[in-house]
Amino acid sequence: MQQAGSPTPPPSRAGEGATQVRSPGSDAPRAPAATDAGNGTAPAASTSRHDDYHRASARRLLLIGVACVLLVTLLLLDLTTGPSGMPFADVWRGLKAGPNGGDLDVATILWQLRMPQTLMGALVGACLGLAGLQMQTILGNPLASPFTLGFSAAAGFGAALAIMFGGALPIPNFVVIPVSAFIMTMVACGLVYLIARLRSASPEILVLAGITVLFFFQSVQSLMQFLASPEVLQQIVFWLFGSLLKATWTSVTVCALVFVACLPFIMRDAWALTTLRLGDANARSLGLSVDSIRQRTFFLVALLTAAAVSFVGTIGFVGLIAPHTARTLVGEDHRYSLPLAAIIGAVILVGASVFGKFISPAAVIPVGIITAVAGVPMLFTIIARRGSEG
């Protein structure tokens, strides 16, 4: 019972508890729980998304690291296999001794024969993997590759032309053939670009122009094979098989210079290529110059393809398999898929070289044949997946 004159406590309002909840064993009042769902969950959701992004990035970097380890392993394995046979201990001693040290026979086999072929396989595979991923991105076609636009057929025509008539020039064939193949590849690039510019640089126009150039160079190449003598025909067919046996330190240097020169421009456009996967309309709405990026990428693809096929011949399916494998592992972010596609392309070609030496040590099977045979099941898998998704 209250005494007269004492103040009456105000009635408690909704949301204002008259009694404070104290933690057990303590006189300090517990902080009131947040009741605003928006203020309480937004920071947590943002932190969760941030953590998910970092976990995904770490996973992608881990996969790239694993691919690098696999590539180094295959490079060493490729150096230890060959018709002459060489144990790993001799290879390791030869690598440490250098090209001018140690056993002369080991140094000659390792540094003058096997090393250029192994490095050339890695470089050509990396070029084709990068070119294939860029080609599929700018064309929006999962079955596109560096050969879709006729670049490979043009290189084959240039090589056949040099083999047939290069003897009339006072220049060695090992110089004339790759130079002619490179020039004809860039001519094909110019033809496709010219045809596309007559209408627009849309993916459909580029593909149609590429198919036109492809059939043109294939038909002329077939005519040259028909008219060639048996000896010349044998040389043309062997070049078209795609073999690393033609690799030299000069060809390795040229291919490496082209690859290193193109790589900064490719990685600079990684975000633009990722945006392009959203479609032309969405890319334009985000401020991307779609035609400019497509033309620039198109030229880089031509350079990479020319550097790859001019020295070793036609090698198929690497530019198709490597991009799909990279996208499956790391997704559409080209900051990760571009380097991974290059590494996977190198892994495929060096692995094909190792496999060819294992199954036929006396006469090494050209890597172009092995990649073509291995690429057929992959192509069927891609078609089946597209059919189930569509």
Show the residue positions of the predicted features:
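Alpha-helical transmembrane segments in inner-membrane proteins
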Residues: 2-9, 13, 19-21, 25-390
